[in-house]
Amino acid sequence: MDLPEGPVGGPTAEMYLRERPEEARLGMPVSLEEQILNSTFEACDPQRTGTVAVAQVLAYLEAVTGQGPQDARLQTLANSLDPNGEGPKATVDLDTFLVVMRDWIAACQLHGGLELEEETAFQGALTSRQLPSGCPEAEEPANLESFGGEDPRPELQATADLLSSLEDLELSNRRLVGENAKLQRSMETAEEGSARLGEEILALRKQLHSTQQALQFAKAMDEELEDLKTLARSLEEQNRSLLAQARQAEKEQQHLVAEMETLQEENGKLLAERDGVKKRSQELAMEKDTLKRQLFECEHLICQRDTILSERTRDVESLAQTLEEYRVTTQELRLEISRLEEQLSQTYEGPDELPEGAQLRRVGWTELLPPSLGLEIEAIRQKQEVATADLSNPLCGVWQWEEVIHETSEETEFPSEAPAGGQRNFQGEPAHPEEGRKEPSMWLTRREEEEDAESQVTADLPVPLGAPRPGDIPENPPERPARRELQQALVPVMKKLVPVRRRAWGQLCLPPQRLRVTRHPLIPAPVLGLLLLLLLSVLLLGPSPPPTWPHLQLCYLQPPPV
């Protein structure tokens, strides 16, 4: 039997209108059967993917109709939806679902007994619309009671009443659709008439606007004509004034031509000057590059000087340690000398047994013993410190040659810490015979250094008794010409370090003690030999040469700025 069609305005119709918007716009009637099938497909596809599983559709129909999977009609539907036998993986889209379900419903109507199932399916579709979308309880018949509170299979009488009311609503819907179509046609006719009237009004407005524009144009032309007349009179006056200005401009042009010739001559002179300035700028650029290279070389030399200075500092520290060791050794030698003196005094029974001359010579020999070697070593160290302090930065000023020579000669004298009588050796002579002689400067020539070394060796030789000593002969120090030049700005003229001449070994050691020992018959020779051996050991263990710094050879370039 044919199922009645439901109203378009119901919830099922709304769902169908969402699925088929074209048919709803055209006002095509939708059957109740198609609405039920759409509701069934929507219930099985809550995610709106467009495809549902065949097993899900069968489970939904089993839950709605209350039939088991062994039902022959459901098995026939399963075979129709899954003709390839894919099993649980089989899916079907909406169009295929509608076609298969219509064929299946028609086949069931031919065999009869489908009215109850259709009514039950329709009631299940309505119930599924009331349930929330995507709820798994819609697929189980036991959970449907929790939403509606009743069994999903209502009574047959209530279902028949509902179907009859749906048929009435569908008939009224068809009548409303016909009336709506008539109203739409009349509305379209009215809209066409209104459009024609609007076009006519627009044409009239255009004509009115063109007429107004023509009138305004005529007025504007009249005003413009008056303006042109006035302008013509003013132009005539301007023409006369322009003629006078043209004659004046010709005179000015002749004057400007003369000025232009003068400017061209000046321009030629300026071009020549520009060429000269360019050449001068190139020369200055070359000088700048040369100065940059010299500056780089000076910086490199300063770095080397700092490195050498650090090495000299380490050497000074090591020399300080060596000096401390020498002090300890000197103290031990001093104790040994005192012990030997005691032994020497014990070799005789008493001072009364010695001859009077021997006693006097002994007293003189005791009084004229050499001073402490520690004082001499301290004096040498002070001299080295002063010489180190005199080393100046080669880039920070002028090396004062004359002052260095005088200062060096003054520093050669040892500080006298003895009594007013002075320090004397065994023979009553001054302990430092070289005090009256200037110490050779570090800037002496090689020949002068050799002569000084020979004089030192000659002074160190033993002098026979009664012979005049070299130190007793007055000797004038050689005079050296000192350059007295103004302190001026310096620039380096060499690209390498100039080593400073070092002193000879004889100049760096302690000043030798020129001893003239009187052979006393009571003093044994081994004791004198031991004393000489001690003095030689002190001379050999003297301090190392003082540290020197590298200096640049500089020349005067220009006076320094004041």
From Swiss-Prot:
Residues 164-349 form a coiled coil. One of its GO terms (biological process) is spindle assembly. Residues 543-562 are perinuclear space. Residues 1-521 are cytoplasmic. Residues 431-448 have a biased composition (Basic and acidic residues). Residues 541-562 are annotated as: Interaction with SUN1. Pfam families: EF-hand_9, KASH_CCD. Keywords: Chromosome, Coiled coil, Disease variant, Meiosis, Membrane, Nucleus, Premature ovarian failure, Telomere, Transmembrane, Transmembrane helix. Expressed in testis (at protein level). It is found in: Nucleus outer membrane; Nucleus; Chromosome, Telomere; Nucleus envelope. It comes from the Eukaryota. GO terms for molecular function: dynein complex binding; identical protein binding. Disulfide bonds: none annotated. The keyword Nucleus applies. Residues 125-153, 407-481 are annotated as: Disordered. One of its GO terms (cellular component) is chromosome, telomeric region. It is a single-pass type IV membrane protein. It is linked to Spermatogenic failure 88: An autosomal recessive male infertility disorder characterized by non-obstructive azoospermia due to primary spermatogenic arrest. Core component the LINC complex which is composed of inner nuclear membrane SUN domain-containing proteins coupled to outer nuclear membrane KASH domain-containing nesprins. SUN and KASH domain-containing proteins seem to bind each other promiscuously; however, differentially expression of LINC complex constituents is giving rise to specific assemblies. At least SUN1/2-containing core LINC complexes are proposed to be hexameric composed of three protomers of each KASH and SUN domain-containing protein. As a component of the LINC (LInker of Nucleoskeleton and Cytoskeleton) complex, involved in the connection between the nuclear lamina and the cytoskeleton. The nucleocytoplasmic interactions established by the LINC complex play an important role in the transmission of mechanical forces across the nuclear envelope and in nuclear movement and positioning. Required for telomere attachment to nuclear envelope in the prophase of meiosis. Required for rapid telomere prophase movements implicating a SUN1/2:KASH5 LINC complex in which SUN1 and SUN2 seem to act at least partial redundantly. The C-terminal 22 AA is required and sufficient for localization to telomeres at the nuclear envelope. This is Protein KASH5. It comes from Homo sapiens.
